[in-house]
Amino acid sequence: MKRLYFLPAACLLLALPLSAQENLKNENLRTLSADSILTGDARMDSLYRHLPEVMVVGERPVVKASAGKLEYDLPRMIEGRPVDNVYEALKELPGVVEQDGALTLGMQAVTVVLDGKVTNMSGAQLYALLKSLPADRIERVEVMYNAPARYQVRGAMINVRLRHRIGDPGVVQGEVYGKYNQEHEASFEERASLLYNGRKFSADFLYAHSHGESFNTTDKEARHWQQADGSTHLINNYEEMRARSHTHSLRLGTDYTLAENHSLSFVYNGAYATSHTRQNSTGTQTAESVSGQTSWLHNGRLDYRTPIGLKAGAEFTWYNAPGDQLLHSRMGDDALDFYTEDGQRINAWKFFLAQEHQLKNGWGLNYGAVYTTSVDHSYQTYENEELKKNEESGLPADVRSRRREQTLNLYAGFSKSFGRKLMTDFSLAVERYKTPVWDEWDVYPVLNLTYLPADGHILQLNFSSDKSYPDYWAVQDVISYLGGGYSEIHGNPLLKPAIDYSTSLTYILKSKYVFRAWFNHTKDRAVQTLYQSPDELLELYKYLNFDFEQQAGLQASIPFKAGRWLDSRLTLIGLWMRQKDSDFYDLPFDLHRLLGIAVLNNTFTLSRKPDIRLTVDGRLQGRAIQGIYDIPTCGGLSATLRYTFLGGNAVLTAWCRDILQTSMPCPQIRYARQWVTNEYSSFRSVGLSFAWKFGGYKEKKREAVDTSRFK
């Protein structure tokens, strides 16, 4: 297994979503939808981890406000949009944007949960599951900029409520799906799902298989200063990377209703994946690298709900990912020849108890406890080809570790409705976080106020605090090689969790125009950065804790339409961002930047019978920063054609993304004696997908065996 914690190498900035809103009778309804930033290669990851999100508002979909959350009718919002799975559907929500292959909401990292159940799975594993779930499974979505403690989540949360029952008892429904995407290389996906609804028992089954090849390039130019003799070395490297992969995903969910508000449910998620990568470098350095990785995931969760408001549950996760790499590299008089194996095995358990009370006069009370524990078994070994073992080879020392992590969370909160116009929700959580390095107690308050002054007008004020923990592999004391060996990826066992404080004010005017202001302050923000070593010709990629990061922003989203043939929205954002680190090697910095973002999304109805729609989305973003990195202006343009037929049960979709091949920025460093430019490849992609929903039929009734005369 090769874990790459370094500055990413590819990014697709695609503006996808378009949605709408509508005021229905006496309900306060509104929509929003979001732009998306897609990353194509792991090495571009950290560049987009902290870029601003884009909240986009449409005109047709509906949303209702309640205490601390917005309830969206997402199935209506994605009608006519090129959305085939739950992950893509969530990007239609207001303020949701994809950065580094992960979803963010309102300038914050966001936790996505299914049916209110927080999982032990990592973000990447959860997103893989969401991408395999058909969008048709969504019943509704709850969005919270600051989730109350009773949800066992801190910070922003998206709760996806799945459909578990369809029609009358005995009904079975399913979907088959196929996808072909041609970028530089081709990739494919096949998926099948079934949903069964009984009188007391319901079940869902899903299998998905994604596979294909990928290709990308990196053109690096560097001026590397050496302290010993004051010389500057010119580095020009060109890298090509080809990879192929297979991923199999499986989900089985069951629900059994014992009585009203009395139920038992179990969900299993499994995955098996393989990948093989070959990388070649030419120029100042010549290198060839071959690597592979295999991973297994097993996750099971049991939930029990009682009529008195008591909930209890347990979850287990097992993950294993061994990998290897063979590298031959030459740079001047230096040579690297080695074979390395690494791996990670994680066992994680979670147990919880939660109690909720609905009291008189609009009061609600909730409290509970959550305990999680995990053990991370990781290793990394190096073998020199000539010595056949890691002796006097100059390679990193072998590492084998067993790291245990424990978290205990105790919380209590209340909610109160003051008539129909004012709602409040407050909670307080106390948490202990214990690892071999840290043993800390923290307090997390959350406050949400919602005010509905009139029909179509919504005002929501939020304040929260949050803590985000580093990835397991990021805190291992390991060293990996990247780009033929000129770049090294270092783990950081002393990496701290980051603490975030955020507040936001959202105002929706006439259920149509959305205005939002926000401010975030993150202490000990963990960011992976590049640093040119002054002692040797070596680039270091390592996660470090900045002193803090601050972001403040304003946003206006304006939907408009022309007749029945065009739905559009324009989103404008102004953002101020600041990052400070007083102990960044020998180069302390305190940098800030003002930038703007403009997004225009259009859906053209070419025909209603047959149902044919064209979407054209464009985005332009100004210069941003990440530490001493300067991220230049970038943009993206995409188009999608969607044909729905067979009574809405069949959908054929074709697309062209990154039409102008301008979505990939070329980040650079020009700070003190640090001088680097990375040019990453950007390829236009075209694709075709087909989805067919079937069923809605009842289970056949078969004649029972006559046992009336048996004993």
Features from the language model and the residues they span:
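N-terminal periplasmic accessory domains that precede
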Residues: A42, E53, V86-A89, L126-A128, ...
